[in-house]
Amino acid sequence: MLFCGINPGLMTAATGHHFARPGNRFWPVLHLSGFTPRQLAPAEQEELLSYGLGITNVVARATARADELSAQEYRDGGRLLTAKVERLRPRWLAVVGVTAYRSAFGEPKARIGPQERMIGGTRVWALPNPSGLNAHWTAATMAEEYGRLRAAASGDDGAGLPG
């Protein structure tokens, strides 16, 4: 499973740790949904590999807010992400933020959940953005959606997923 954020925030850029801003709910939601046996801190991101999980971004440029990115940056990021997925061949790509998914892959009507698109043999799922700015989703409702992904991924053969 490769999780893909939108782009590094300023705190992530400063620390080198994904989803590092204290208000970001990625790490709590990852645990609440059963992907990790305990809540990891951003500085523990390397432990994801031991659970069969990886993490990357659509766009490498750090910004204070994702809306500072251009449409071209998203499109270029989508192409680079596709190449990365083709090289690494995870079973699943989980794009954390449906708006980023829509922009990166040119699918303006995409919704949260499994996507028809596949990248090689990799299945794709768009997840809600765990940023504290996303008030439409609570940690609990996000954990439900992340849990749906986990259940679908476990149905493949469960390799690398805890539980």
Residue map of PLM features:
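C-terminal capping/extension of enzyme domains
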Residues: 21-22, 29, 65-81, 107-163
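Structural motif
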Residues: 1, 52-53, 122
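A short, flexible beta-alpha/helix-coil linker loop
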Residues: 8-11, 61-63, 130-133
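Short, surface-exposed acidic-centric catalytic microdomains
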Residues: 12-72
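Short glycine-/acidic-enriched loop or helix-start segments at secondary-structure transitions
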Residues: 12-15, 102-106, 136-137
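N-terminal nucleotide-binding beta1-loop-alpha1 segment
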Residues: 3-6
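Internal catalytic-core helix/loop-beta-alpha segment
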Residues: 50-109
